[in-house]
Each structure stands twice: as C-alpha cells, then as structure tokens.
C-alpha cells in the first residue's frame, strides 16, 4: 500500500526503515520484490533493537547483512541497502558493535536519534554520553549515515554531525503528532549539514510534509519570515542529494543523463506562475493528490491517475483482507 500510495502522490524514491519482529528473515527481500514489481526506487533496512530479546536482535542484524549482500550481487540501480537501527535507548553498546561488525563498512546506517528526551536521558544515565557521541564512539556516523529526527541534539552534537558529514532527515508531522518537539532545522541548516525531509510513515504526500515543515519552523521560532529557503531546499534539492548517496543515477533534475523521474500535476494557477515563484505555488496551491502522472526512471507508473500494469482494486482488496486477518489475530475477534 505504501508503494501504491506513493506512486499516486508523485513519489519515485523511498527510503524505508522496516520492522516486523514476528517475521524477520527474508522480509527485506520480500519488500524489494514488491518495489521492483511496482517500479519504484527503494533503499531498505531492518530496524535492529534489543527490545525483543537477543535472538530477535541477532536475526535483525543478519537480515540487514544478508540484504546488503543481496543488493551487492544484484547491482540493480533501483534497489539499495542501508543498515537499520532503532532508537539508541533500545540498542546496547554490544549490539552496536555487532552491527558494525556485520556491516563491515559496506553501507551507512539509518537510525532514530534523539527523537524524544528519553533517548537523551537513557544515553546519559547508562553510558555517560549523549546519543550522537555514542554513535561517534561506535563508528556509526559518516557521509552515508542517515539520522532520523535529531530533535534534542545540542550544539556539540550538531558539530559532530557536521564534521562527520552525516545526514539528518526531519519528519515534521510525525514529531508534532507524537508531541515530542520540533527539529532545530534552522540551526542544522546553518551549519551546512545535509538535511532532508521525511515522513516517518505519517504520510506519503511530500508536499504535505513541506507545508507542515514550514509552519512548524515558524511556530517554533516565533518568526513568520523564516524557514522558506530551508524547507524547499530540503525537499527539492537535499532529498535528491541523499538519494544519490545510494543510487547511481543523478536524481531530482531534468537534464540529459539524469534519471527520468517526472510527475505531472493537475494544477490551474490563479496568479502568474513561473520558475521564480514555483515554490510558493507548490506550498500554497498543490498537494500530492493532484499528481496526474508519475514516471520513475523512464517507466510510466501512473498515467492520467490510472496505475499502469497494476490492478488497484485487486491490490486494495488483498490489503484489506490482510489487515482484517492481522487485526483479528491481535484482538481475538472477527472483522
């Protein structure tokens, strides 16, 4: 469903941080096959955590390592792997060492960092270090590592992130929905940190995230004239730069040799529209649901709002039945 909804809202590239501790082995391969079938570009990882016990933790580490090996062998330009980790308060030093050993320098890491203050308190109380410092101690940081959230990072941690070339992804709707704070986007951006925009699965509409990111930064800083350049750069420039760390094609631009990722929006402007004010039209006038056609790597995935080569009704029926089955098993009732 994630992939179908992404196509319908003009998304061509997905970085997914997966967890399903009831079924670990082979899950990333299964997701990769669906991504391939539907035609999107995907960078996948499994969420390593100690919270379900050592056996599950070791399985999660192996799932990441196995999928990295699979991607190395497949050499598919539409598929990539990154090593996943949950929040630091569920990962011990021993587990970090195991992750680094299993990865063996092949990829970066995709991990939740300082999403809530409990992550900071846990690191200080149990390890005597703040979260970003712990990651640095274990060799997790670097130009191919993505830190999700980074709401409660201090200035010293920001400098470490900058010095190591580590990437940060802001997830504004998720953070506001969980009432855990607002990412210090302006401070991170000012330091030259590669800062992208994500969703944390809250939505598949990146234009929705764009609007919320702008409003949240202005509200947090009590200034009505900040954030415009930062949030538009994050979505339209930096996300492509992050994608290029893991995929071989040039992304996010229309020029010879670049990936042919193109969307057509059903939008009628009521004020003059040009390259000088397109950001304003996208923030205030457009939503992902206005996407009419989606093309990824030159392949048309949706044309005139009709998915190409996909029976959407059949897919939706299958997903609904799977959801009913899952809910039934969890709640011991029939839906």
Please report, for each region that a protein language model flagged, where it lies by residue.
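Hydrophobic alpha-helical hairpins/lids featuring a short glycine-rich hinge
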Residues: 1-22
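Metal-coordinating catalytic core of metallo-dependent amide/deamination hydrolases
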Residues: 18-151
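Active-site microenvironment of metallo-dependent hydrolases
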Residues: 235-335
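His/Asp/Glu-enriched, well-ordered alpha-helical/loop segment
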Residues: 137-140, 144, 184-269, 283-287
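Divalent metal-coordination and catalytic microenvironments
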Residues: 10, 35, 83, 112, ...
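Glycine-enriched alpha-helix->loop->beta-strand junction motifs that scaffold or abut catalytic
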Residues: 39-41, 102-108, 140-143, 160-169, ...
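Catalytic core of soluble alpha/beta enzymes
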Residues: 115-139, 143-166, 174-186, 203-209
